[in-house]
Curated annotation (Swiss-Prot):
Organism expressing this protein natively: Mycoplasma pneumoniae (strain ATCC 29342 / M129 / Subtype 1) (Mycoplasmoides pneumoniae)
Protein name, as recorded: Large ribosomal subunit protein bL19
Disulphide bond pairs: none
Lineage, uppermost ranks: Bacteria, Bacillati, Mycoplasmatota, Mycoplasmoidales, Mycoplasmoidaceae
Function summary: This protein is located at the 30S-50S ribosomal subunit interface and may play a role in the structure and function of the aminoacyl-tRNA binding site.
Gene3D superfamilies: 2.30.30.790
Signal sequence annotation: none
Keywords recorded for this protein, A-Z: Ribonucleoprotein, Ribosomal protein
Amino acid sequence: MKKINKQALIDLVEQKQLKAYVPEFSAGDEVNVAIKLKEKEKVRIQNFTGTVLRRRGKGISETFIVRKTTDGIPIEKNFQIHNPNISIELKRRGKVRRAYISYMRERSGKAAKIKERKQ
């Protein structure tokens, strides 16, 4: 019997959990995250559309932060990219020079706009 080390076993299990397709996006992009919520027997989809502040990690633990403003109240949510209960749709590409645009937290209104990246 072949002996497998712990890390190889972990990698093997994680590989099965990864999504087959994840859209390519980065900080500054506008995405729509459709979250499947199960309420008793009923399953409903809640959309969360906003700007990606950061994408970090790799493999099964890769995450990203999305920020949106609703009625003047800013909301930020952390999502796991390979979560089977979410689907990610890229709305538009944003032009930023940083991997983590934390300065967007202090901005509101017109100052919070991000230029669109040309293809």
